[in-house]
Regions:
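Conserved strand-helix element at the start of the C-terminal RecA-like helicase core
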Residues: 43-54, 96-120
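Conserved nucleotide-binding/hydrolysis micro-motifs of P-loop NTPases
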Residues: 22-25, 108-110, 143-144, 169-171, ...
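Conserved SF2 helicase motif VI
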Residues: 191-209, 231
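Conserved helicase ATPase core of P-loop NTP-dependent helicases/translocases
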Residues: 123, 132-167
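Inter-lobe coupling linker of SF2 helicases/translocases
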Residues: 1-73, 88-92, 214-289
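A short beta-strand element within the Helicase C-terminal
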Residues: 175-188, 212-216
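C-terminal accessory regions of helicase/translocase ATPases
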Residues: 88, 125, 261-334
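Conserved helicase motor "Helicase C" RecA-like lobe of SF1/SF2 P-loop NTPases
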Residues: 107-140
């Protein structure tokens, strides 16, 4: 079989769709700083509030403010609105080909009308824009292997042209690449391997499109930009490790799912220099720890070197005694 690479249309890399933060979101981020300060000062118990809860709320607010404030109005300049515009434009442009698209979102799964869901809202707005309801599907609705196979076949054949799902449910094993023309990251996952799994659905053999589009939606002044920046940093370190770069002595835990107080405060400032400083401070702290470990090991090695002459002398005496004993062994006869 001939190997054919699937390429990005937008200059060989994902396209960033930047969305401005609303005044309500900016104010909410400031409350996250106050919560982080209370946690750092010990004013609240871990079961009452913690950095993981703050990080989750920050990510939800960056995705859609209605996830943290259900009574808030729809943001016409937000990520959902931007995604609707991009998905609809590509849907129109690829009608003759019956091109399909994937939308990834981990933070807000379908609720079945019980409470606000980004999935339900996005689907309703896509329908309102003119996309037939039968051409939109949630991967969550396919609960059995047979249902998944039926759904995936519909995507490959172009009968379902917009499929929404999470990394866990639409990652490994989702073979729908035949007509995929675009992929949309509505939120950022935590691990580089999750980004790889998402984009691996479209950048793979069997896709009839020679060029595809990948979108990353980012709300400015929110947790989004820092999340993607962190993902790229982690991915770079992992790539260096996999290549056997001997200059890499340690790698932070890629599973960590909470930002620090300093990172939250830096994000709230909205100043890129402050955000950069938070990253530099974290790097300095990590290097300081590594230096302390190296210094302690060096002291231990120097102490060991100081004891080696005495150990050698003692062992040489033992060897001499063993040799003296060996020379005097008398053969035993039965």
């Amino acid at each position: 079989l001939e190997f054919r690479r699937v390429l990005f249309r937008s200059g060989g890399k994902p396209r960033i769709v930047a969305c401005p933060a609303s005044p309500s979101l900016k104010a909410f981020v400031q409350t996250l700083v106050q919560r982080a300060e209370a946690i750092r000062n010990g004013d609240v118990k871990p079961n009452e509030d913690n950095m993981l809860a703050i990080t989750t709320d920050g990510r939800k607010a960056a995705l859609d403010f209605r996830l943290v404030a259900p009574l808030a109005c729809f943001d016409e300049n937000g990520k959902v609105a931007a995604c609707v515009r991009e998905v609809h434009a590509i849907w129109q442009r690829t009608t003759d080909f019956r091109g399909a698209q994937l939308v990834f979102c981990d933070l807000s799964s379908p609720k079945g009308g019980k409470s606000f869901s980004v999935y339900d809202d996005l689907r309703d707005r896509l329908i309102g824009a003119g996309i037939p309801e039968k051409e939109i599907a949630f991967v969550h609705d396919a609960e059995t292997d047979v249902q998944k196979a039926t759904l995936f076949k519909a995507v490959r054949e172009g009968r379902v042209r917009v499929l929404l799902g999470s990394t866990a449910k639409m990652g490994v094993g989702t073979n729908v690449q035949t007509r995929l023309t675009a992929l949309h990251h509505l939120d950022a996952p935590w691990r580089p391997c999750d980004v790889e799994q998402r984009e691996g659905r479209i950048l793979r053999q069997g896709n009839e499109c020679e060029e595809v589009e990948v979108f990353r939606y980012v709300t400015e002044g929110s947790f989004d930009s820092y999340m993607w920046q962190t993902l790229e940093t982690k991915a770079r370190f992992i790539a260096q490790v996999m290549k056997g770069d001997q200059g890499i002595r340690s790698l932070e835990d890629v599973e960590l799912a909470a930002l620090s107080y300093a990172e939250v405060k830096a994000l709230a400032s909205g100043n890129p220099l402050v955000i950069e400083k938070a990253g530099v401070d974290a790097e300095v702290a990590k290097l300081s720890t590594l230096f302390s470990v190296w210094r302690n090991q060096r002291y231990a090695n120097e102490s060991e070197v100081g004891r080696l002459p005495m150990m050698i002398e003692a062992l040489e005496k033992k060897v001499a005694l063993y040799a003296w004993d060996a020379a005097r062994i008398e053969p035993q006869t039965m």
